[in-house]
Curated annotation (Swiss-Prot):
It comes from Penicillium rubens (strain ATCC 28089 / DSM 1075 / NRRL 1951 / Wisconsin 54-1255). Residues 206-239, 299-423, 440-473 are annotated as: Disordered. It comes from the Eukaryota. Residues 375-385, 459-468 have a biased composition (Basic and acidic residues). InterPro entries: Mdm34, SMP_LBD. Lacks alpha-helical transmembrane segments, suggesting that it resides in the membrane via beta-sheet conformations similar to those predicted for other outer membrane proteins and porin. Component of the ERMES/MDM complex, which serves as a molecular tether to connect the endoplasmic reticulum (ER) and mitochondria. Components of this complex are involved in the control of mitochondrial shape and protein biogenesis, and function in nonvesicular lipid trafficking between the ER and mitochondria. Mdm34 is required for the interaction of the ER-resident membrane protein mmm1 and the outer mitochondrial membrane-resident beta-barrel protein mdm10. This is Mitochondrial distribution and morphology protein 34-2.
Length: 556
């Protein structure tokens, strides 16, 4: 398969060269130029030469009468040349200062004087080699895409060939610009030229656009005064609207000039610009009740106190800040205690209520309470009244606190409260028996003071009771009081113990061996010490085996 490329019509068509020169001029001025070039680049001469490029067909994708698509290997070493004209800056100091900021430059007086010299550059001896994707269509023209950089070398001849430094500089800069031209701009130039040659509609449209541009350029005269004709909504200098009769009565000789008429819309925009944050934008959002430092002088600063604030940044008063922080702190503490100790829901309820109702003052009662050591009470309460008895301080805190607005109504928890609770005491009886601790529920409370006569609780001589299902230790904030207020009606109505069970009652006829009493007291003290040592040595009271057998009673 052979192809015949007719290169001579391109050389003979003058209109083709004119159009190609215009396209090349636009392409060379489109890309950013080096600062040494101070004028536009004009293509004054273009010649494709008599030697056509050599094409080697690598692949044909589509072949028809009106379309073609293929891949070629192109190589060109011909006599085409291109002549350019421009103006360059001969003073390098001027070029250096133009590319540096003014505040950092020395600003010389005479050494930086610009010196522009006309420059003529001729590009010749092109050597091209590369792979070309060619797509031809009579309706869409020719599309040429280079897969690689086709420029191998070229010769640059200029006015400064006698200066080696300038010659080398121009050679390097022009080669860089031509590589960009071949990869980006040349395919678009070839496509537009092909449309002008083969598509009549495109040619007609371009001719009409050229005529329109020429007419617009010729009709342009001196600038028209936009204020010569009155605006649509005229107002005077004071902002008062003017009607048509007032406008018609105005003349050039009158005291009110026509140029003093302004549009209401323009006045609003000027007012918005004045009220903006010293920016050039007409739509800068304004912030109410804000005093800007740039607006006030040092004398005006004292007139505006610091209390002038923006609604977007409200004042953070001490009460609001303290209420938010303390309430969140107490809520966090209450949640942590709720998760770690399920049986202390009543305590966490009171803690969260206390945190929600904060904010009445900076120094609340929580800071006034003394830190007390928590005492664990493992004895099961006798009655509901004793178990739910609360200390006077806790009751006063809960009852005297006013309801907070921020606190929402919370459900009532029926579980036994873990707030400071006064442990139930044994009923006051006339018997004085030594205390024998329960072996299946060891107590971790601090040892209270005992009199010389150790009182013996009647719990030790009762029958074994059912084990406590809830093994969670019950805590209290204070030890056993020495003197206890009279108990509830349930504790006062307990059945007195029979006389046979109380051998140590104050009876003159009772004969008790004091040696036996001392021996039993020593045995009880030894057992208490052993239990305490075992409790401290073991991992906890959870692993201890419950012993349901009560200790032996005295006198039996």
């Amino acid at each position: 398969m052979a192809f015949n490329f007719n290169w001579s019509p391109l050389m003979a068509d003058a209109s083709f060269y004119t159009r190609a020169q215009d396209l090349l001029t636009a392409a060379l001025n489109k890309s950013p130029k080096p600062p040494i070039i101070v004028d536009d680049i004009h293509v004054t001469e273009l010649n494709l030469g008599s030697i056509p490029p050599e094409l080697e067909i690598l692949e044909i994708g589509d072949l028809a009468e009106d379309r073609f698509r293929g891949i070629f290997k192109m190589s060109y070493t011909g006599d085409a040349f291109l002549t350019l004209k421009t103006r360059v800056q001969a003073n390098p100091l001027n070029t250096f200062l133009l590319t540096r900021p003014t505040f950092g430059s020395p600003v010389p007086l005479a050494a930086a004087t610009p010196l522009t010299i006309p420059l003529q550059i001729t590009l010749s001896d092109f050597k091209l080699s590369g792979f070309v994707i060619l797509v031809f269509s009579k309706q869409k023209g020719i599309t040429v895409v280079f897969r690689n950089d086709p420029l191998e070398s070229l010769k640059v001849s200029s006015t400064f060939d006698s200066i080696p430094f300038v010659r080398d500089f121009l050679q390097k800069e022009i080669e860089a610009q031509l590589r960009i031209l071949f990869m980006d701009e040349l395919p678009a130039i070839i496509h537009r030229l092909s449309l002008r040659l083969w598509v009549p509609e495109y040619r007609t449209g371009e001719e009409m656009n050229d005529e329109t541009d020429n007419t617009a350029k010729s009709s342009e005269g001196p600038g028209q005064d936009p204020l010569a004709s009155p605006p649509q909504d005229p107002v005077d200098s004071l902002g008062n609207a003017l009607n048509e009769s007032e406008i018609a009565s105005l003349s050039l000789d009158s005291s009110v000039e026509t140029h003093s008429l302004f549009s209401q819309k323009n006045l609003l925009r000027l007012a918005a610009l004045t009220d903006s944050q010293r920016t050039l934008s007409l739509f800068t959002p304004s912030i109410q009740e804000v005093v800007y430092r740039a607006w006030t002088s040092p004398t005006d600063t004292s007139e505006f106190p610091s209390s002038v604030i923006s609604p977007l940044s409200p004042t953070l008063s001490r009460e609001q800040s303290q209420m938010g922080s303390m309430s969140s702190l107490h809520e966090t503490a209450s949640n942590a205690s709720m998760q770690s100790r399920p049986s202390m829901s009543s305590h966490s309820f009171s803690t969260s209520t206390y945190g929600l109702s904060l904010g009445a003052g900076r120094h609340s009662k929580a800071h006034a309470r003394k830190r007390k050591k928590r005492v664990v009470d493992l004895r099961r309460p006798k009655t509901t009244d004793d178990a739910m008895s609360v200390s006077d301080e806790s009751v006063m805190t809960e009852s005297s606190r006013p309801p907070s607005i921020a606190s929402a109504p919370l459900p009532i928890v029926n579980e036994p409260s873990d707030d400071p609770v006064t442990p139930p005491l044994s009923p006051e009886v006339d018997c004085h028996l030594p205390i024998i601790p329960e072996r299946h529920l060891p107590s971790f409370s601090r040892p209270t003071r005992r009199d010389a006569d150790l009182s013996y609780s009647h719990e030790t001589i009762r029958g074994p009771k059912a084990e406590d299902v809830d093994a969670t230790p019950r805590a209290t904030m204070r030890g056993y009081p020495q003197e206890r207020a009279e108990a509830g009606p349930s504790s006062n109505q307990r059945t007195p113990l029979p006389a046979a069970v109380l051998p140590f009652s104050k009876d003159e006829n009772a004969n008790v061996d004091p040696v036996l009493v001392d021996r039993l007291a020593g045995e009880i003290a030894r057992r208490m010490r052993e239990d305490k040592l075992m409790t401290n040595a073991c991992s906890g009271f959870w692993s201890r085996q419950h012993e349901d057998s009560p200790p032996p009673a005295y006198g039996h």
